[in-house]
């Protein structure tokens, strides 16, 4: 325990360098800008900036990505409040009361509430990182090859299923990702697989290129296709922004309840902020003493939604960092960033790389304070970003996609791979398939394969080794549950969203 406290303290010392502080400010600002642009997502923003972190120290690069993540989740509330168009699915419930407050001349108050609630939801969720992540990491140290295989299968079944609207489509997306993960040289005997004579595929598909293509370039195609539809412009506002002491006192119980809800949802693989925001909103409505205000601009509704969706951020990092199971698309991209940096998500992050991990944790805490400061000071300015035309947005994102993919190895083949995955992502979204499931399978596929083949090599080919330990059986049961859980999750999500199912 004492050693952990010392590592926490050292983490804050390392996080408070000028480089890391600048990374927090820049990441939060960029995240808010991305989040408040309807059509862009936190996952897309993190994927887009991933190549730029290659030249940074590992902890600084992760802090930048974490800052973009937090900033984008809050940024989605800006357009949700001002133009009734959530910048990200995580702010869908915020639009219900937030836009009504705008119509009532309280846009500034709504934005201040969203920012204040986001800060506390995110800050409280950081406590989970400190208290639960190290404990789970110690448990993960007991995982051998067979357990790692079933852990990968568990992650694939839950994420590929729950993150899609149907079991079949979710599993199809996951299967496609597994197929793509097989491209390149066999990790055991070096046999060529699906390379078709192309030497640049020897190391497999570059995860960063796939991320940029699936999340960013595909969105460019979507925006270009919808260019003929003019987006509603953000409304101006002039009311006072600051929350009163009485309002903060009234909102505190809502913040605490939404933090608990969002944290639990974040830890569960396959769930996400889009579900948490509606659960937080519904909970705020159920416990409110002024239920008649809901639907007409209830400040508690904005608070409940934003505190819950930002509480997801800290919780969602726990399964990714400790078990290597990214719970949603954003943490899948962050996991890709770890892999690219040569770091394997799991218990080693808390032993061999403890200094880097706790620096990232400390940075994640400090990011919440920068988000509060920048959000409060820049509400009026960020609101104008929502007014940007797609004619400006599309070419800017396109240039970033090309530059980002080329910068990885300074090779045009990476640009080609990015474009191919961009087209693939566009087609998948047109056919309502989940792009996040492809990325998760692309990352988890090699982990499962190495676990399976490693276990079989040790046992001399005896399949019984896969069923020998109690941990394996626990993961098998969880995997079976994961396959069928989308049915229950879909019914639950339909209930909390009033019939509208949202995707990350």
Language-model features, listed with the residues they occupy:
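Transmembrane alpha-helix interface/packing and boundary motifs in multi-pass membrane proteins
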Residues: 28-42, 71-84, 159-164, 260-269, ...
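A structural-propensity feature for long, helix-poor, extended segments
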Residues: 69-80, 87, 298-323, 327, ...
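Membrane-embedded alpha-helical modules
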Residues: 112-228, 340-494
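Membrane-interface alpha-helices at helix entry/exit sites of multi-pass transporters
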Residues: 59-63, 100-117, 289-301, 329-332, ...
